[in-house]
Every structure is written in C-alpha cells, then in structure tokens.
Amino acid sequence: MSKPGLDAEVKPKILFYDIETKPLLAYIWRLGEQVVNHKQLAKWGYRYDIICISYAWNDGTPAKVIHWGYEEQDSRRVIQEFDKIIKQADITIGKNSDRFDVKHINSQRLLHNLPPLPDWMDYTDDLERQIRKYFAFPSYSLDYISKELGLGGKVKMEFQDWIDIVEKLNKKSFIKMCDYNKKDVEDTRALWNKIQPHIKPKFSMATFYGDFRCIHCASKDLKKDGVRFKGKTKYQTFFCKAHGGYAGRVAIPSETKRTIG
C-alpha cells in the first residue's frame, strides 16, 4: 500500500551493497604486534582481492551475491557483473563503504584494466558515516547495531573460514561466506531505512523528482513546521505526515524553484 500523498511514480533505484575481501599472506619471523613490510608478502597473497559482493535493491527483495567462484577465484568477473548493477542505481549505499568498499572496488577495476567509474563517488552514501554523525553508540560495528535495533546481528564467521575459502579446503565455508555477505547487506538496508528519518542523506527525493516533496520518502503530504535560521538565511521547515518526521526546508524569501533541500 502506498503512503498518503505519494503518487504512483517511477521510484529512485537505491542499491545497498557489501564486499568481502581475501586476506593478505606474509612471511614473518615471530608472532605478536609488528610492522610487516611489503617485501614479506607471499606470492599468492601479495595483494587484496574481492571474494564476493552482495547487493539488494530498496524494494524488500532478498539480497543476491556475485562471487569469484570457489574453484575459479576470478574477481575480474565479479567487478564486471557488479558494475552493470551500479549503472542502474541512482544512489549506492554501504556500511563503511567510503573508506573500504569503494576503494577496494576501484582498485580491482584498475588492477584488472576494467573501465573506470570516477563519478561513482558522486552517488554513494555511507551508513556508518551517517550513524557516527548523528548518533552515539558504544560500538559502531554492524553486529552491535544490528542486535541493538532488533535485527539479530551478523552471521558468525571465523578466520578459519577465510583460510578454507582461499585455500579451497572447505566449500561449506564458501557457502557460509555468501550467506554472511547477504545478511550484512539486508541489515544495512534495514538499518538505513530505520535511521533515515533522523538524518539528512546525500540523496534527496525532492532533488530526484525536481519538485516540492519530502526529501526522505517523496510524499507531498507535508505541513509547515516552524521557521529556522542559518546564518543570514531564514528557512521554512516542513513535517512529513506520511513518515512522521522532518521533510526538509525552503529558504524564505526565495526567487528560485521551490525544491526542498
């Protein structure tokens, strides 16, 4: 059932995603905390690689996974397939993705001589960055926040599972990794939708549609909710009756088109 005030229109394509990477392998002289030089990296474990990428659209459908193949271990194909998905999205969202996932995916494009997507960063957002900006939790791990907000936490993985996958010792670990990856994405999606009314995301529904509506859910069922000042600018703020929260603001007076920002 559609929310009041939300027309039957083309919806923006919001993509949630998460990657899992291969560990590095190095020769060391002792155990414990130490600095490992790049010259100590073993031949088959000298650079990062992507085992799988899970993704889900913001339509409630289950997450899917693109993996490198238990036997083949071909990450080039993973990036090629995922880039086809990215190009369909209006916004992509991960957790700690600005610092981790995006850079790893960009690196694999470079290493595999695949077409670059330098504008990708223009339409990404990061669940962890938004949570750290607007909230205070004892831990910002996905496992902790997932449990705290009723999603059950992450699928349990052990470091041995990564070894079993990389060395092709146990296919069950590979299957578990894919399930682990998909659960992370589904939790990212659920958490994003839960926190969204409390934050100001990079992606605005009002900007997407190019008119006057809620920046979060695209509803037009709004009411005025007080006046605020920022510097010398006066703003009319709005409340969204559809999702029951902040809907955006408009500068007063404004000679420009009325688009909530």
Task: Give the role of each language-model region.
Residues 215-219, 242:
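Short, cysteine/histidine-rich loop/knuckle motifs that typically chelate Zn2+
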Residues 2-86:
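Conserved RNase H-like, two-metal-ion catalytic cores of nucleic-acid enzymes
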Residues 237-261:
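Short metal-binding segments enriched for Cys and/or His
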Residues 59-144:
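Conserved DEDDh/DEDDy metal-dependent 3′-5′ exonuclease domain
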Residues 226-237:
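Short linker/helix segments within small regulatory modules
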